[in-house]
Amino acid sequence: MEERAAVEYWGDYKVIAELGHGLWSRDVLAEHRFIKKRYILKILPSELSSSENFMRVFQEVIVQLAAIRHASLVAIENVSREGDRYFVVTEENGGTISLAQYLSGRKLSEEEVVHLIQQLCDALELVHSIGLAHGQIHLHSVHVSFFNGIANIYLPEVGFASLLRERMFSTIMQSGSARESITRIRDLLMFEAPEEQEVFGREADVYSVGVLAYYLLVGSFPWGSFPKPSLCMPDSWYDWDGFILSCLQQQREVRPKCLREALRRKTSGEQLQVTLDSCREPLREMEIEDTPTELGPPSALIREGERLCEVKEEQHAFVLVEAKSIDEVMVTTVDSEEELESSEGYANPLQSLLAREPVVSRYVEVEREEIKPQPLLTEMIFIEGGEFSRGSGDGQRDELPVHNITLPGFFLDIHPVTNEQFVRFLECVGSEQDEHYNELIRLKDSRIQRRSGRLIIEPGYAKHPVVGVTWYGASSYACWIGKRLPSEAEWEVAASGGKLGLRYPTGEEIDKSKANFFSSDTTPVMSYPSSILGLYDMAGNVYEWCQDWYSYDFYESSALEPDAPLGPPQGVYRVLRGGCWKSLKDDLRCAHRHRNNPGAINSTYGFRCAKDVK
């Protein structure tokens, strides 16, 4: 953390205001020095930053959370480090308060409870789908944000609360009086599932949701022999009894697998079914006078049925008719051969009618070949392999040490992927998410729009590089056309002119006549002169995703293992190269390294593809 003229900085972010302290972070409102956009920084305390056990789990959780987006979850942009302290950069929100603060002196209507619980269930289902759990759901870990005066669920501690259970209790004991601390800890323990001290998972979250729903409806905790919600809210239209009691099951295996499906509204049809079920048993015990005790042949049944239908209007009786299949009727026994013969005139034609199979023409679907959108391919340049130098002695610390590497030959697209190319990929896959629910692109941050189900490119932007695309989208597109993303080493070698080792892709100097930077928007690809190797837009226009995970000190490892280095085996964020239309001149250097998490979306992020030599 730097101090400049009494202004607090964390990396490229200037602190504007303090927002408070959460369970695992100090939260501040900050502004990026260059792009002038506001973010919320969640700064880890030094004791957590120095804990290897916490940081190992922290890294895994951050990587998973960064890949998903939901209005009720923290939107992670990237993770950075300043000295020995880590901080998480998240999107700015309108401010939140804890659910306990929101409920102070307030009684929620059933509609408000339904709105909040449905949002909580939706967010947790998404978290559970990626293998995470919230843990420690209670009135202080669940927050609410406000939009147009409506309270909405917000979960700032998802994935971390269960890791810091002891820290939370210790903080409570150190603040307030002993009586207040004990009362608050007691209330927190009310939300814990029976197994939660040993196991933190989806089932524990489900139990806590049941406790929270009961508290919001009734105003007390479901402790001991508690009254069902239906007794406290007899006019409710929701099956709160079924939902809450299923969540509060002692055996975690029998709790609901899907919270959204468990919470359902009682329809009139369901209420009618409940009424019928309650009436069925008494009706079966009722006897109708003058009912024959002996079952006659089918013909007699018909005549008896006709007689019973001729009931006078003043006679009223409840009759319960128990349905039987026609097979059961047809095998009804008779007492004599004479009665059997008399029924043949009815039975045989009926059996013949039932045995007759209807003649239905077989439907044969006409096979039509589905026409898939075909890719628009980009011309590629062959980059000859060999030994090259990478890194810089006058750049950032992550560009050191300068060292030699060896690479085999490879092909590289002459320009970044354009909107007209990427839109064909979206039409082919039919979604803006991949099979793992990772966003490929966020249309509102791009120049592609969906209107009436069709994808439309904004006028004049067909030849512009696609933006708003994630690393997942870039990688999926490359796979779709039979290519891949370039490695960080390949990208730098191609940008620096191979063995020439240029400072900028355009040479030793660069100006605004040679590249699109420090401007207001993207430009069509190939609008500026090509590099010495015939590549366009290697400097400016859009940052380009690379295949590698980013590591601050990877060049030290690369210097020891120089043969076709491909980044660390895992990490928090992926590499971006080349600078963009917003960048300053220094960001356009061939050796400059940028990074962000693979799910990050930005109007300055694009990509180009590479291919191996076969």
Curated annotation (Swiss-Prot):
Name recorded for this polypeptide: Serine/threonine-protein kinase Pkn1
Single GO MF descriptor: formylglycine-generating oxidase activity
Entry's family note: Belongs to the protein kinase superfamily. Ser/Thr protein kinase family.
Keywords attached to this entry: ATP-binding, Kinase, Nucleotide-binding, Phosphoprotein, Serine/threonine-protein kinase, Transferase
Gene: pkn1
InterPro entries, alphabetized: CTDL_fold, Kinase-like_dom_sf, Prot_kinase_dom, Sulfatase_Mod_Factor_Kinase, SUMF_dom, SUMF_sf
Binding residues for ATP: 19-27, 42
Listed Pfam families: FGE-sulfatase (PF03781), Pkinase (PF00069)
EC top class, as a word: transferase
Native source organism of the sequence: Chlamydia trachomatis serovar D (strain ATCC VR-885 / DSM 19411 / UW-3/Cx)
Role played: Together with the serine/threonine kinase PknD, may play a role in the specific interactions with host proteins during intracellular growth. Phosphorylates IncG, an inclusion-membrane protein required for the modification of the nascent chlamydial inclusion.
PTM entry text: Autophosphorylates on serine and threonine residues.
Reactions this protein catalyses: L-seryl-[protein] + ATP = O-phospho-L-seryl-[protein] + ADP + H(+); L-threonyl-[protein] + ATP = O-phospho-L-threonyl-[protein] + ADP + H(+)
Subunit record text: Interacts with PknD, interacts with and phosphorylates IncG.
SUPFAM superfamilies, sorted: C-type lectin-like, Protein kinase-like (PK-like)
Domain Protein kinase intervals: 13-276
EC number per UniProt: 2.7.11.1
